């Protein structure tokens, strides 16, 4: 049996798509910088009250700048460079090594029939996205 990277990538896309997983690289540094800068300017212009107003306005602006930057995990997976897809493939292949399949459709059906395999693959995927990509996971309901 030839194990294909593409089959496993399609499987991981199906799993993460079914769970409506999204990920965003954290931009908290950007938000903190904007908040701090606005508080500083507010303090220079208006003294202590200006500091409070500048901090509040900066916090809102920073939150607005960093919101809505989540992308679907399947999209992120398909945009990964081949070397990263190979890393994911190696980790997933270790989990599903006992399965035999001929194509991505059959592989997906086999995994979807096993809650244990789904959980193992999802845990591996969440670990990869949070640690390697330094992204935050969000689930849409």
From Swiss-Prot:
Induction text: Up-regulated during adipocyte differentiation in an in vitro preadipocyte differentiation model.
Keywords: Cytoplasm, Disease variant, Endoplasmic reticulum, Hereditary spastic paraplegia, Membrane, Mitochondrion, Neurodegeneration, Transmembrane, Transmembrane helix
Coiled-coil intervals: none
Pfam families for this protein: C19orf12
GO cellular component, one term: cytosol
Keyword Coiled coil: no
Domain of life per record: Eukaryota
Effect of residue 85 to P: In NBIA4; no effect on its subcellular localization; no cytosolic redistribution seen in response to oxidative stress
Effect of substituting residue 52 to P: In NBIA4 and SPG43; impairs subcellular localization to the endoplasmic reticulum or mitochondrion
Residues spanning the membrane: 40-60
Membrane topology category: Single-pass membrane protein
Record: disease: Neurodegeneration with brain iron accumulation 4: A neurodegenerative disorder associated with iron accumulation in the brain, primarily in the basal ganglia. NBIA4 results in speech difficulty, extrapyramidal signs, oromandibular and generalized dystonia, and parkinsonism. Most patients have progressive involvement of the corticospinal tract, with spasticity, hyperreflexia, and extensor plantar responses. Spastic paraplegia 43, autosomal recessive: A form of spastic paraplegia, a neurodegenerative disorder characterized by a slow, gradual, progressive weakness and spasticity of the lower limbs. Rate of progression and the severity of symptoms are quite variable. Initial symptoms may include difficulty with balance, weakness and stiffness in the legs, muscle spasms, and dragging the toes when walking. In some forms of the disorder, bladder symptoms (such as incontinence) may appear, or the weakness and stiffness may spread to other parts of the body.
Family from the record: Belongs to the C19orf12 family.
Name used for this protein in its record: Protein C19orf12
